[in-house]
């Protein structure tokens, strides 16, 4: 991994020996350096420290001030309109970040795919897919384990407060919409709309043929006298005429094509990956397009550098506004409080234990300085509750703060922000079992396995939009026959938990980029060598080839001798 600039959150190089010994030595060295710095600290050192870490310090201060300001204003019981006015600076930050998401996803993916050959891209893509799958499955397992051990749903659901309304979506239609959105028929429309199945009713009419006694027409005829036969025939004809005029009408719900507002991130990711691979395969013919998207990406990142100074102000008002919107803080107590605590513990174990452990086992480096370098993006994720809106800040932290290779971040981050949702998968599995517990519904091993698989698959469709977990949770509940209307029991705390699971999602994407970069060092070095070699010129390359052949000949002679 490339070297990093001087910062408060430098990554420690892994020492030799065992993994735990290396981590212990790294922490001891850092403590010793910190002690020496404190002893020799001057006013100039303090000034340089503040200048280097201004973004992080301002953002952390904004969170503290926002929470304090919100609780100070709650006794005044502001109206909904006043709260919206108060939250306006935070809304501006969301709009600024969302403005940059679309060009950033397209430009970064196209340049990332075009800068790598197909073989290297395939290997990196396979590593990314394995990482996404492993971390998501572990997250689901942690969620199921926590809700089973703590058992927050013990008791009756009568004491829980319902809030909002949930739209029921058939599982098959939801997954078909996911696949449809991967291939948008109109790229311009994909920039502001997603395909979403709507439902309509139509009147269906059917004619039912039956006799008065429920038997089929003519079934009761028997061979008797001619008079009786004629009477029977007349009766049957009369019944038949009456029956043919009987028509039953009923309403049927049918799916119809529809749309929902919002960027179709999944479709743009699929198109950008394919487009970038094609440009990369065109070699010098695609250089103009590659340079265009590279310049576009650079321009977007410079805009991010400007907007980032406004981020602390926006985060302050976003967090304060959300706390002021809560009607009753008492909902965090009791049964719902235990549910909230269970989710927090699960997310903390995954984000603070599993992900750093994966980073350490793969790279043999101390993960906590790396996480510290991501603090700006993590706090922004908490404020915006959207991994897609946090994407510009995540790029900046990884590339400029931590020095992760741009070819990796441009490939991994946009895809990860769309399909890698560890926090959402953990939350959906945990919430589904919680709803089963409050309904006194015993789940068997097969149903728990179904929840695990469905939560893993449904998290892919969450697409980084705020509170998407509530929408995809309908799929998880439907898969095991749990009542979808009981999602309203947990909406009261979802705004808070949504921010925590977004932080987990962003951290998972960031650590994934670092892990994939470490595993792809050989491909990256070979790619750099191939890009450098053409600039040397044909005479020099032929000379290198001759020297290489001569050295092979000498090596063969030496081996014979």
From Swiss-Prot:
GO terms for cellular component: glutamatergic synapse; Golgi apparatus; intermediate filament cytoskeleton; membrane; plasma membrane; presynaptic membrane. The modification Phosphoserine is found at residue 2. It is a multi-pass membrane protein. Na(+) 2 binds at residue 418. It is found in: Cell membrane. Keywords: Amino-acid transport, Cell membrane, Chloride, Glycoprotein, Membrane, Metal-binding, Phosphoprotein, Potassium, Sodium, Symport, Transmembrane, Transmembrane helix, Transport. Brain specific. L-aspartate binds at residues 385-387, 424, 465-469, 498, 505. InterPro entries: DAACS, Na-dicarboxylate_symporter, Na-dicarboxylate_symporter_CS, Na:dicarbo_symporter_sf. Residues 368-398, 448-481 dip into the membrane without crossing it. It comes from the Eukaryota. One of its GO terms (biological process) is establishment of localization in cell. Residues 1-52 are cytoplasmic. It catalyses: K(+)(in) + L-glutamate(out) + 3 Na(+)(out) + H(+)(out) = K(+)(out) + L-glutamate(in) + 3 Na(+)(in) + H(+)(in); K(+)(in) + L-aspartate(out) + 3 Na(+)(out) + H(+)(out) = K(+)(out) + L-aspartate(in) + 3 Na(+)(in) + H(+)(in); D-aspartate(out) + K(+)(in) + 3 Na(+)(out) + H(+)(out) = D-aspartate(in) + K(+)(out) + 3 Na(+)(in) + H(+)(in). Na(+) 1 binds at residues 416, 420, 505, 509. Glycans are attached at residues 213, 229, 236. Homotrimer. Contains eight transmembrane regions plus two helical hairpins that dip into the membrane. These helical hairpin structures play an important role in the transport process. The first enters the membrane from the cytoplasmic side, the second one from the extracellular side. During the transport cycle, the regions involved in amino acid transport, and especially the helical hairpins, move vertically by about 15-18 Angstroms, alternating between exposure to the aqueous phase and reinsertion in the lipid bilayer. In contrast, the regions involved in trimerization do not move. This is Excitatory amino acid transporter 4.
């Amino acid at each position: 991994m490339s070297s990093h600039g001087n910062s408060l959150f430098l990554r420690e190089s892994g020492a030799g020996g065992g993994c735990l010994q290396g981590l212990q030595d790294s922490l001891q060295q850092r403590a010793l350096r910190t002690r020496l710095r404190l002893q020799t600290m001057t006013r100039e050192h303090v000034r340089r420290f503040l200048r280097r870490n201004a973004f992080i310090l301002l953002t952390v201060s904004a969170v503290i001030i926002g929470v304090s300001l919100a609780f100070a204003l709650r006794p005044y019981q502001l109206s909904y309109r006043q709260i919206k006015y108060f939250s306006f600076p935070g809304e501006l930050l969301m709009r600024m970040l969302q403005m940059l998401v679309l060009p950033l996803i397209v430009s970064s993916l196209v340049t990332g795919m075009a800068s790598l050959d197909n073989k290297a891209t395939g290997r990196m893509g396979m590593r990314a897919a394995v990482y996404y799958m492993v971390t998501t499955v572990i997250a689901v397992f942690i969620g199921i384990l926590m809700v089973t051990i703590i058992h927050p749903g013990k008791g009756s659901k009568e004491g829980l407060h319902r809030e909002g309304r949930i739209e029921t979506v058939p599982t098959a239609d939801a997954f078909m919409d996911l696949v449809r959105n991967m291939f948008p028929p109109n790229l311009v429309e994909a920039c502001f709309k997603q395909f979403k199945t709507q439902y309509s009713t139509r009147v269906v009419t059917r004619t039912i043929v039956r006799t008065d006694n429920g038997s089929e027409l003519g079934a009761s005829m028997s061979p008797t006298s001619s008079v009786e036969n004629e009477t029977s025939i007349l009766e049957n004809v009369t019944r038949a005429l009456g029956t043919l005029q009987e028509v039953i009408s009923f309403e049927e719900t049918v799916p119809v094509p529809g749309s929902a507002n919002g960027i179709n991130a999944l479709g743009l990711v699929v198109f950008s990956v394919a487009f970038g691979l094609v440009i990369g395969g065109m070699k010098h013919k695609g250089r103009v397009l590659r340079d265009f998207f590279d310049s576009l990406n650079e321009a977007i990142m410079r805009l991010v550098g400007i907007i980032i100074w406004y981020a602390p102000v926006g985060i302050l008002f976003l967090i304060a506004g959300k706390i002021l919107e809560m009607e009753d803080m008492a909902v965090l107590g009791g049964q719902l409080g235990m549910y909230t605590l269970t989710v927090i513990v699960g997310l903390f174990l995954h984000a603070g234990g599993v992900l750093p452990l994966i980073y350490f086992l793969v790279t043999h480096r101390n993960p906590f300085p790396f996480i510290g370098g991501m603090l700006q993006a993590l706090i922004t994720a908490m404020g915006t509750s959207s991994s897609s809106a946090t994407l510009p800040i995540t790029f900046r932290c990884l590339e400029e703060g931590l020095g992760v290779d741009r070819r990796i971040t441009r490939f991994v981050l946009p895809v990860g922000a769309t399909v890698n949702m560890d926090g959402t998968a953990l939350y959906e599995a945990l919430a589904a079992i919680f709803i089963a517990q409050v309904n006194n519904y015993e789940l068997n091993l097969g149903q728990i396995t179904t929840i695990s698989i469905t939560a893993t698959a449904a998290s892919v469709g969450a697409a980084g939009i705020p509170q998407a977990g509530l929408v995809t949770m309908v799929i998880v509940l439907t898969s095991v026959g749990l009542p979808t209307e009981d999602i309203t029991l947990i909406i009261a705390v979802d705004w808070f938990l949504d921010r925590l699971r977004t932080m987990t999602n962003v951290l998972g994407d960031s650590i994934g980029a670092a892990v994939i970069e470490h595993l792809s060092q050989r491909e990256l070095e070979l790619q750099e060598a191939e890009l450098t070699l053409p600039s040397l010129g044909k005479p020099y390359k032929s000379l290198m080839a001759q020297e290489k052949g001569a050295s092979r000949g000498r090596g063969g002679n030496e081996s014979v001798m």
